[in-house]
Every structure is written in C-alpha cells, then in structure tokens.
Amino acid sequence: MIIPKDKKWVQVNGSEVMGNLWASFNIDLSDNYGRLRIGQRLIVNTDETDDADIGVPVAFASINSINYCIAGSKVFKSGANTPNSNFTEDAISGVPTNLNSLYSDMASFNGYLYVSANSTSVYKTDGVSWSSFSAGSNTGSPRLFVQYADRMYMTDGNAKIISWSTSDTPATSGAYTLDLSSNADTRRITCMRASASRIWIFTTNLSGGKALVYEWDGASTQPTRSYRLESSGAFSCVIKDDIPWIIDANANLLAWNGGTFQYITGFNRENHKLLTGIFSTTNDRFVHPNGMSIVEGNIHILINGSNNDNTGTIEDTIPSGIYEYQKEFGLVHKYSFGLTKSNGTIVDFGQIRISKAGALSELNQPSTSSTRNGTFLAGAQIYTNAGSTRNVISYDDQNSTLQKAGTFITTKIQSSEVTEMWQKLYVGVKKFLNDNDKMIVKYRIEEVDSTQISCTWTSTNSFTTTSDISAYANNDEITVIQGVGSGKCAHITDLSESAGTYTVTVDETFTGATSQTFLAKIDKWKKIGSLSNRNASYLECPIGKSANWIQLKIWVTFTGRKEEIETLYLVSAPNQFAK
C-alpha cells in the first residue's frame, strides 16, 4: 500500500478513516504539492523579556513603511516594514496609553492609522504625529473597525455601529449607523468585514440560540438582509475573492455561497467539546476577530485549541497555532508559537497548548535588506512552564534559518480482510541536510486515550510527576505540550515510583530542561524505527502485528526548506479471511 495514493495528502477532519491525515502539527503541504514538509518555525520578534508592557498582540497594521501593533495598553511599532524588525513602544507625543487587548482594534483609513481604546476617544497617526477625537458613548465592550467606501465604521457598545467620514466627524444616529440593540444578548457584534459592495456583521447569541450574520449597505438604518447560522456565533472572518469565510462557535470553517454560509470543513473536535471562550463578551475567544488572514493567497487561521472545560484540556487533533486551508488538502496545522528568538537556543519545537490567541496579519512587504525574514506577524500569550505566561509577537522563518519539527498521524488504515498482518513500513525521505535532523516512526493497533500530566524536569532526559501513570511502562510515548520541550516526543526507558511520585527517564535529550515545570501527555504509541543518517533515502520499520486496522505516526526534525517526506510504503497480507 502506498501512502498517499495519487501523491495527494488530505486532512478531512471529522473522520478517522477518510483522507490520509488524521492529525497534524507544523506540517506544510503547500510548499511542494504531493510531498510533506515541515512548516517554518515561528520566531519570537519581541516579547515581555524585551518590554514588560507588552500585552496580548491583537492587531497589526502598516503605514508609511512602519509596522504597528496593539499589545495591551500600548502601541508598539517596528523600525522597518519587515516582519522580523523588532518592535518598541511608540513614544511620539499624543500616543494612546489606555488601550486594552480585550477591546481595542486598529485599521487604516484616509492615509492614517486609527486605534480604538477602552474609552470614547479614537486615536490616529500618520506615522509622524498622533491626534484624537471623540466617537461614541460606550466603553467596556469591543470597539471594532471596518473601512468601507469613504467611511470608517466602529462598534459602539455591544450591538451598535457608528461611523465617520474623512473629516472625522462621527455619525452616531441616523444614516451611516446601525443599531441592533433591541435584543443585545442575541445580537452581540463579534466581527465586521467589508467586501466590494457590502459590510458583513457577525454576531454571537449569548442566550444559547442560533446567531445571525447581517449584510449592510453602510448607509441605511436597517440591515439589508440577515442570515441564520447553525451555531451560536461567528467570531472571525477573512474576505477571499470577495467572499467572506468565517470561523463559527463550533470551530467550523464556513463560506458564503450566495444564499447562506456553507460548511467547508472544521477543526477535528474528537470529543465534540466547544473550544475556549465562546461565551466571552470580549475578544478573548479561541479565535480573535483579527485571527484570520490571507497569507500567500491561502486562508490561515490562528487558534487556541484548548477546550472550554475546567482544565483547558487539548485534543491530539487540535493543537494550538496557525492552520492553513486549501481545497486540495483540507485544514492542516502549519505553524506553532515557540519560545525561541532568532539568535537564541532552541528549547522547544512549538507550544501545543497556549493561553490566548491574538492577531494574524500578512505583512509581506518588499525590502532590500539582507536580513529580511518573514511573511506575516502573529500574536499570542504562550506558556513558559506549567503555569507562567509570556506575550509574544512572532514571525515565520521563511529563510529557514532554524531547525523545526513536526508530527503527523495517518487515518486508520483498514485491513483488506477481517484482520491483516502488518509486516513492515518503508518511509521514503529526501536526504537530510543536517546531522541533527531526525525522523521517528511509530504505530498503534488499538486506541487508548492519552493522559495529560503535570511534570517537573530533573535533567535534560528525566522528570518527575505526581500524576498517576501506573498504567504506563517502558517504550510508551511522552509528548511535551506546554513549556520547555513542547512539540517534542520521546519514549520511556525507565519508570519508577516512590510515595506517589514517579520518576521517568526518556530516550531523547530536551535542550534547556533543568528544573522547570511543564505539561505533557502520555500515550501508547509504539516506536518501530528512527533515522538520522544523512545519506539514507528511506527507513525500513518492522511491525509484525496482526489487527483489523493500523495507524501510523511520524515525528521529524528538519533544518532546510526542501527536506520532505516523500512516500510511505506499508507492506501487509491478509491474516484472517471472511468465509
């Protein structure tokens, strides 16, 4: 059996058997169609270790060759228009200092950059100076922007929209305003976007019913039309080819088809739990209103994959980070936030679990700088250990300067008869470019739910935990999901227990691990082979097990852009025939 058949990798989501990818983490299927590469590492541009005032980055924009960001109460700007140019606080006279990541927004209009605060003031800059004016009367709720025709529109309160023209004179009632507040809890505005001929207004229903999407001409006092969603809300939107694409409360990707919002695909919620923050009255949800962007022509979505439960559990199929959608291969996890800066030591391969999701924006500006790097900026609040957080502004390492890692899990491969003897697996790869590059191959023939555990590093290859892991043993798998080592897998070589504390030794080295706390999950995946030989073009992995299905998992570290997994060859023969 050859995987993928017809050289086409596909992640359907919502099925264990359709397509050939069940789960992905840092996987790039668009860089070389038909081959599987690793998504470029997200490098930290600026974080709280550079400036303690940085909050969650929730908006990015560019004006006059300067990139701007709202992160907490302050405006930050870069020294150049490239994504890897570092951010510092804007210190020009009049710059606002009363912003809030839960409420504020940023957008360009009429040659200026407009910024909303948690007040009735609106601020604007041309990159040289700042000024402000009063608009609206409500505070304590998101003040979201959308520019349409020759006006800027802003939410004022939970269910009202005001606007102003190039003269910055606000219209607060009548023409060019909209008031949906007759039943505000069922029409709470979450996002606005403009296409060529209309404004799209997205809402959430906090009363538990279905939400509505409104179409508006920007001038009338009533919406042009309304459309009912099959969920309680829509939280983020991007316009592609003049069509709105949205993420709804069920973590589904929907697109306008001319008559309704049609289901395209969704995040693979194995346990059907809702994701974090869907009942929030601010912008603190699993996806931010500014969390979708068109990057190099494709839809990208930044999410917090944590479930909306007491402990914020995370499923194997929904790691946090940035996903890419294409019709050809579906919705795939491509990038994850990490702790590493461009000149720093690599101590993780991406945080599977994050605290808060922020903004995502393509800012692929032309530059002749020899150090230019990145095509987009992304913001989040991530974890540095089992509990501490750090706000980060990150960019994608399109120069492929740093090592990265990724994982994929195939769908269940069914036997051709009642049971199959799964004999061996060959994995074809492009020859490695670096001595530190590596591939580890695993399988399972029975499904056991993973266990999330809280741990403390004691060395670079050992840790302790008071979580009950008595059901696990040598050769079982550990994946760090939060803190130092996140995104890396290892297998147990020694496990002992004393007075309720387990001491675990693993077969991989976790650089930077000393005595930090971290979160991990433990599984029953069985390791069947590893490859680190730069001259090898394939790996042979013996299996020798009989079952009615098999699932494969591969974890790799690559350094260069063009390293890739080419093809899987699964060798098997029927074992038990149906008679």
Q: Where do the model's predicted regions map?
A:
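Blade-level signature of beta-propeller repeat domains, shared across WD40, Kelch, NHL, RCC1
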Residues: 357-411
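Repeated scaffold domains used in trafficking and secretory/extracellular systems
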Residues: 52-61, 96-110, 137-150, 182-196, ...
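Beta-propeller fold detector
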Residues: 85-94, 131-136, 171-181, 223-229, ...
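Short domain-boundary/entry signatures in modular proteins, especially
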Residues: 35-46, 394-408, 448-454, 519-524
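N-terminal beta-propeller domains
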Residues: 1-96, 102-112, 116-128, 151, ...
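Small/polar beta-strand repeat architecture
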Residues: 449-524
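Non-cytosolic beta-sandwich-type ligand-binding/adhesion modules
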Residues: 4-10, 78-86, 90-92, 118, ...
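Surface-exposed ligand/attachment interfaces on beta-rich extracellular proteins
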Residues: 50-52, 94-98, 134-139, 173-185, ...
